[in-house]
């Protein structure tokens, strides 16, 4: 009695529904791939890329550009290799004094620190020994030394760069000093109180030492300038590094301060002569 519907209405062919859904999925996936391929880079990315390109170009320019060679600073040995050593002159000392004090003193004070050429004895021409040089600049040494009776003062003061050099100069002066008394004036292993006591108790004719200790003795009234007739600087001698005493910053500073402690004033007054050995 019922109509024959053939296949049941709920039974559909297996391939219909299943085939339609995958087709849609494939279509969507292809569209998404296309979108990915056509994706336009953002503004930030473009700026970043431009910066990277610019940096790389600048780096290439720097690599290709010739590098500037740094000038090698000349050493003392380089200068001596090109030019023979020259003896120090009064002008050398005058120039150093002016350069050291020009920004620290008034115009009037600088005038008082000027050392006229008349304050100097003949400088060493690099042919002398210490004894022969002293004999030349102190022709009346024998008479001066015999008449010297004052304590706390010396007739001749020799200024050098170090304690070791002081000991060398004491040996070199033997041919000149005769029977006169020599005292070493440096700080190494010797207390300043002991040096002051020795100067107070004994008559000393020659003092040899470093500028720092000599100035300290003058400042503490251990060494008087009243009897001093000659002030000699070990100007031309060079150490193992080929430095003269005024090439060593600390020694240079102490030497110029020593000159300012009354020695320039004494030389300008005519009681003291300066020599550059």
From Swiss-Prot:
Residues 35-52 have a biased composition (Basic residues). Residues 24-34, 53-66 have a biased composition (Basic and acidic residues). GO terms for cellular component: 90S preribosome; nucleus. Gene3D superfamilies: P-loop containing nucleotide triphosphate hydrolases. PANTHER family: PROTEIN CMSS1. Residues 1-91 are annotated as: Disordered. Transmembrane segments: none annotated. Pfam families: CMS1. InterPro entries: Cms1, P-loop_NTPase. This is Protein CMSS1. Belongs to the CMS1 family. Residues 1-14 have a biased composition (Acidic residues).
């Amino acid at each position: 009695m019922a109509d024959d519907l053939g296949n049941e209405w709920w039974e559909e062919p297996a391939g219909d529904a299943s085939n339609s859904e995958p087709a849609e999925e494939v279509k969507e996936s292809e569209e998404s791939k296309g979108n990915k391929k056509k994706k336009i880079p953002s503004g930030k990315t473009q700026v970043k890329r431009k910066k990277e390109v610019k940096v790389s170009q600048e780096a290439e320019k720097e690599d290709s550009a010739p590098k500037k060679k740094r000038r090698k600073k000349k050493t003392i040995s380089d200068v001596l290799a090109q030019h023979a050593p020259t003896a120090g002159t009064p002008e050398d000392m005058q120039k150093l004094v002016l350069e050291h004090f020009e920004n620290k003193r008034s115009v009037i004070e600088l005038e008082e620190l000027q050392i006229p050429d008349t304050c100097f004895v003949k400088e060493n021409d690099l042919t002398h020994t210490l004894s022969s040089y002293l004999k030349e600049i102190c022709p009346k040494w024998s008479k001066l030394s015999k008449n010297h009776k004052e304590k706390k003062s010396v007739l001749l003061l020799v200024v050098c760069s170090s304690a070791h050099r002081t000991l060398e100069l004491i040996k070199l002066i033997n041919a000149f000093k005769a029977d006169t008394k020599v005292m070493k004036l440096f700080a190494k292993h010797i207390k300043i109180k002991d040096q002051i006591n020795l100067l107070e108790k004994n008559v000393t004719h020659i003092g040899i030492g470093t500028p720092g200790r000599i100035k300290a003795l003058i400042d503490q009234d251990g060494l008087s300038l009243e009897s001093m007739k000659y002030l000699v600087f070990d100007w031309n001698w060079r150490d193992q590094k080929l430095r003269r005493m005024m090439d060593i910053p600390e020694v240079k500073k102490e030497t110029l301060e020593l000159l300012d402690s009354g020695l320039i004033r004494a030389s300008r007054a005519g009681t003291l002569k300066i020599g550059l050995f």
